[in-house]
């Protein structure tokens, strides 16, 4: 009694299946990381956890939600009286999956991944209406050198071959997030 269960809500079954399919098709550039963890990956896990929370009358806490589907599920669960708290992170409020494209995409690999503009807006709406209770940092700082350390070398260019499945996930920026968050809050 009195305990609160916290969840990083991503379906490993969906993520593993999607990742393997993409790699089998030779799709390994940074932008495919998001496709390996589609919105359904988070939505399925949130739905499953909310189902048990409601069934067992156990409060739950969701860490760093990133999808419009998950926010809507939490919103509806709260309306039904389910005891649920949820958060998002500054990067899901400020950045989109466009950052995963191109050479610098490796710098924006995180779990859950960055999402679409529609998802980004849904995070702000969730904060505004109280569906989301907190904004956290989930600060995971890894230098580009660390992220690239296990990538294969390209013999022709002496560069690294992109492969979204290899680097550690995480994004720095704790210092900038508070200021960016205040700008967003002031713009409504």
What residue ranges belong to the model's regions?
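Oxyanion-binding "anion nests"
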Residues: 124-148
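Conserved structured core elements
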Residues: 43, 64, 68, 117, ...
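His/Asp/Glu-enriched, well-ordered alpha-helical/loop segment
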Residues: 28-57, 107, 143-188
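Secondary-structure transition/capping motifs at alpha-helix termini
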Residues: 80-84, 130, 188
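Histidine- and/or cysteine-centered catalytic micro-motif in compact active-site loops
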Residues: 65, 89, 139-140, 169, ...
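Metal-coordinating catalytic core of metallo-dependent amide/deamination hydrolases
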Residues: 1-107
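C-terminal helical cap
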Residues: 108-121, 125-129, 177-188
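Glycine-rich, charged/polar anion/phosphate-binding loops
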Residues: 71-74, 117-123, 165
């Amino acid at each position: 009694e009195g305990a609160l269960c916290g969840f990083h809500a991503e379906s490993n079954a969906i993520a593993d299946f999607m990742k393997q399919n993409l790699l089998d098709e030779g799709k390994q550039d940074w932008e495919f990381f998001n496709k390996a963890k589609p919105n359904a990956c988070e939505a399925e896990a949130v739905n499953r956890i909310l189902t048990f929370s409601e069934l067992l009358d156990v409060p739950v806490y969701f860490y760093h939600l990133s999808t419009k589907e998950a926010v809507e599920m939490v919103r509806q669960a709260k309306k039904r009286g389910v005891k649920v708290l949820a958060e998002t992170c500054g990067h899901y409020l400020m950045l989109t999956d466009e950052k995963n494209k191109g050479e610098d995409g490796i710098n924006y690999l995180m779990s859950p991944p960055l999402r679409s503009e529609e998802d980004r807006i849904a995070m702000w709406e969730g904060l505004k209406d109280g569906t989301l209770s907190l904004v956290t940092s989930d600060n995971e700082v890894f230098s580009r050198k660390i992220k690239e350390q296990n990538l294969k070398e390209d013999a022709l260019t002496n560069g690294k071959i992109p492969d979204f499945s290899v680097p550690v996930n995480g994004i720095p920026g704790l210092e900038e997030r508070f200021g960016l968050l205040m700008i967003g809050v002031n713009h409504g």
